[in-house]
Amino acid sequence: MSDPAVPRRPTLDLRSFTPARVALGRSGASVPTRALLDFTLDHARARDAVHAVFDVPRLLADLGALGLAVTEARSRAADRRDYLRRPDLGRQLDAGSIEALARIASRPCQLAIVIGDGLSAAAVHAHAVALVTRLLPLLAADDAVALGHVVVASGARVALGDQIGAILGARMVVTLIGERPGLSAPDSLGAYLTFAPTPGRTDAERNCVSNIHHAGLSNDEAAFKIAWLLREGLAREVTGVALKDESADRAPRRIGTSLPE
C-alpha cells in the first residue's frame, strides 16, 4: 500500500513553479506533519514581521550615507496596537511631524520619497535602502528628476505619503512600505506612486509596484519600473488607472512633454 502522506508527483509538478502550498499530500484526513509544521512556522514568521520593531536610526544612517536629505516622521498611531486597530490614524501625521516637515519645506520639488514600516518592518529593513540605491542613478539619468527630502515614517499607511508630499510641495511622492506578510513572503515591499499628493487621494489615483523581495520582483526590476512610471507620470501629470506600466515596450516620455518623441 502506498504512503498517503507522500503525494504522487504529477507529470507537471507545480511545486517547482511556486512557493504556494500545492500537492501537500495527506495523512488520514489531514496534511502530513511536515506540511503542518511548515505552515505553523510561516504563520509565526508573518506575525513576527507585523510586530517587528522599526529600526528608524539604522535607516536614517544608511540613507544619509547615500548623500540624501533624510528626516523622520510619525503617524498619529501611538503604538503598534493602535496602528492595527485604527488604520485611519496611520494615514495622518502627528502634530510634531507636521511642524517638522513644514520647517524643512523650503521649496517645491519634483519627487519626495517616503519609507514607511507598514505591515512589515522586516521588508523595509531588507529591501528599502537597496532599492533606493538602485533607483537614484535612474532618477539622475537624462532629464534628471529633482529629488527633495526622503522621509522615514513610523506607523505608516500608504496614504500617509499624500500628506507628507503635500507639505513638502512634491509633484510626485513614492511611498516604499512593508506589505501585509503572506505565508510564503513575510518580507515583501511595495512601492506606491501618487501624482500631486494631497490628503484624500484614493487608491485609484496611485500606481503600485508590489511583491518586491528575493523570491519575487528584484530590486533592479522594481527600480526600473518605478523610474519609468515616475517619469511617465510626471510627463503626463497623472498616476493611477490612467497610467499603465509599458516599461517593457518603450522609453518614458520626457518630462514636460505630452507626446512621445
UniProtKB/Swiss-Prot annotation:
<comment type="function">
    <text>Catalyzes the deamination of various vicinal amino-alcohols to oxo compounds. Allows this organism to utilize ethanolamine as the sole source of nitrogen and carbon in the presence of external vitamin B12.</text>
</comment>
<dbReference type="InterPro" id="IPR042251">
    <property type="entry name" value="EutC_C"/>
</dbReference>
<feature type="binding site">
    <location>
        <position position="208"/>
    </location>
    <ligand>
        <name>adenosylcob(III)alamin</name>
    </ligand>
</feature>
<dbReference type="GO" id="GO:0046336">
    <property type="term" value="P:ethanolamine catabolic process"/>
</dbReference>
<feature type="binding site">
    <location>
        <position position="158"/>
    </location>
    <ligand>
        <name>adenosylcob(III)alamin</name>
    </ligand>
</feature>
<dbReference type="InterPro" id="IPR009246">
    <property type="entry name" value="EutC"/>
</dbReference>
<comment type="pathway">
    <text>Amine and polyamine degradation; ethanolamine degradation.</text>
</comment>
<feature type="binding site">
    <location>
        <position position="179"/>
    </location>
    <ligand>
        <name>adenosylcob(III)alamin</name>
    </ligand>
</feature>
<protein>
    <recommendedName>
        <fullName>Ethanolamine ammonia-lyase small subunit</fullName>
        <ecNumber>4.3.1.7</ecNumber>
    </recommendedName>
</protein>
<keyword id="KW-0456">Lyase</keyword>
<dbReference type="GO" id="GO:0006520">
    <property type="term" value="P:amino acid metabolic process"/>
</dbReference>
<keyword id="KW-0170">Cobalt</keyword>
<dbReference type="GO" id="GO:0008851">
    <property type="term" value="F:ethanolamine ammonia-lyase activity"/>
</dbReference>
<dbReference type="InterPro" id="IPR042255">
    <property type="entry name" value="EutC_N"/>
</dbReference>
<dbReference type="GO" id="GO:0009350">
    <property type="term" value="C:ethanolamine ammonia-lyase complex"/>
</dbReference>
<keyword id="KW-1283">Bacterial microcompartment</keyword>
<comment type="subunit">
    <text>The basic unit is a heterodimer which dimerizes to form tetramers. The heterotetramers trimerize; 6 large subunits form a core ring with 6 small subunits projecting outwards.</text>
</comment>
<dbReference type="Pfam" id="PF05985">
    <property type="entry name" value="EutC"/>
</dbReference>
<dbReference type="GO" id="GO:0031471">
    <property type="term" value="C:ethanolamine degradation polyhedral organelle"/>
</dbReference>
<dbReference type="GO" id="GO:0031419">
    <property type="term" value="F:cobalamin binding"/>
</dbReference>
<keyword id="KW-0846">Cobalamin</keyword>
<comment type="similarity">
    <text>Belongs to the EutC family.</text>
</comment>
